[in-house]
Design a protein with these regions (language model features):
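Structural signal for the C-terminal ends of transmembrane alpha-helices
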Residues: 90-93, 150-157, 206-215
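Membrane-helix boundary/juxtamembrane motif in polytopic membrane proteins
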Residues: 151-171
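N-terminal TM1-TM2 helical hairpin plus the immediately adjacent luminal interfacial "cap"
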Residues: 31-102, 118, 187-192, 196
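Small-polar-interrupted transmembrane alpha-helices in polytopic inner-membrane proteins
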Residues: 22-31, 81-84, 91-145, 167-178
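Short helix-capping/hinge motifs at transmembrane helix termini and TM-loop junctions
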Residues: 38, 118-122, 155, 182
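N-terminal signal-anchor transmembrane alpha helix
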Residues: 4-45
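Membrane-interface loop-to-helix entry segments
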Residues: 73-75, 130-151, 195-199
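C-terminal transmembrane module of polytopic alpha-helical membrane proteins
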Residues: 1-15, 172-229
Length: 229
């Protein structure tokens, strides 16, 4: 029985989730670090969060800090929960380094798209004085996990077991419930949430396409090695 458990694909997926563990540890560490900076050294919270107006003015360092900074415990726990549920399966198919890079790259791409692509729409929707004071870049990475999870399903090898497929489908249902289902107590207008979901999804799709291209570029005749005469 124990031997079957050791040989099961699901257990192998969980034990190989080093990139997932790294992402969660980084998010928790940065939460404790920034909490110390804001509470002990009294650094203003707004200096660390993603701010559309500030990023549009050129404060691009906010793109980095907003990815790993959460000023509240609830959105952090939601993000970590979804990462723990979905990322091990994605990591099993694409590898730990690619997962970690995709998670943070999708956040940065999503933030830039959110600010520079839809900044004008956001401003015209909720007003010039009140439009989106701050946002969490890590949340955009959560939205980006859906295209990556679909990619994990499409990659044939290594194959998922039936149990792994069931858990992944259940994780996707949890993902839509926690990540996409609108919350009644959210302070943001619905259009802002929809735009953030769109930006996260597009950034995840972009990362998925890059992964597919890198996995298959040697199969393209242009890049394949030509036989020597």
């Amino acid at each position: 029985m124990l031997q079957k458990l050791r040989n099961s694909t699901f257990v192998a997926i969980v034990l190989a989730a080093r990139g997932t563990l790294l992402i969660c540890c980084l998010l928790l560490f940065c939460y404790l670090l920034f909490s110390t900076l804001t509470n002990t050294f009294l650094i203003p919270t707004n200096d660390l969060l993603g701010d559309v107006a500030s990023i549009l003015k050129g404060e691009l360092w906010r793109v980095i800090t907003s990815t790993v900074y959460f000023s509240e415990w609830t959105p952090l726990i939601k993000t970590v929960l979804i990462v723990l549920v979905l990322c091990p399966f994605i990591e099993w198919k694409i590898g730990s380094p690619v997962l970690v890079m995709s998670f943070f790259a999708s956040s940065w791409i999503g933030i830039l798209l959110f600010c520079f692509g839809f900044g004008g729409i956001i401003r015209s929707t909720v007003g010039i004085n009140t439009y989106v004071y701050a946002f969490y870049g890590g949340t955009l990475s959560v939205y980006a996990l859906f295209p990556l999870a679909v990619l994990a399903f499409l990659i044939k090898k290594p194959a998922f077991s039936l149990l792994a497929k069931c858990v992944l489908v259940g994780g996707l249902l949890l993902y839509f419930t926690v990540g996409f289902w609108p919350s009644s107590d959210t302070p943001e207008p619905a259009v802002i949430v929809q735009i953030s979901q769109l930006c996260g999804g597009l950034s995840g799709l972009f990362c998925a396409l890059i992964i597919v291209a890198l996995r298959n570029w040697k199969k393209v005749p242009f890049f394949s090695t030509k036989p020597s005469n």
